[in-house]
Regions:
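DNA major-groove recognition helix of helix-turn-helix/homeodomain DNA-binding modules
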Residues: 48-63
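Short alpha-helical DNA-recognition segment
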Residues: 18-37
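A short, Lys/Arg-rich alpha-helix, primarily the initiator
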Residues: 1-16
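Residue-level detection of the helix-turn-helix DNA-binding "recognition helix"
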Residues: 15, 29, 40-42, 51, ...
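Residue-level signal for the short linker/turn that defines the boundary of a DNA-recognition helix
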Residues: 8, 18-19, 45-48
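Short, charged recognition helix plus adjacent turn
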Residues: 1-4, 55, 65-70
Length: 70
């Protein structure tokens, strides 16, 4: 499920927040290519980063991974 919903949701949340991939990479101390990989479904962030993403964007981890639509 993470591979199908997460990339699109992450990209939309990042754009809605007015952030570039480079901004997200800096925030999470990862490479820009890691963020790009998350957004195309090539790879997945660790659970700790998922939790931090949910806090940053004000959504639940369940929303990020597609278990909930809100």
């Amino acid at each position: 499920m993470l591979k199908t919903c997460f990339p699109e949701r992450l990209k939309q949340l990042r754009r809605d927040a007015g952030m570039l991939q480079a901004d997200l990479a800096e925030h999470f101390k990862v490479s820009k290519s890691a963020v790009s990989g998350w957004e195309v479904g090539r790879n997945q962030p660790c659970y700790d980063i998922l939790i931090d993403m949910s806090i940053l964007f004000g959504v639940s981890v369940d929303y990020l991974i597609g278990r909930r639509n809100y």
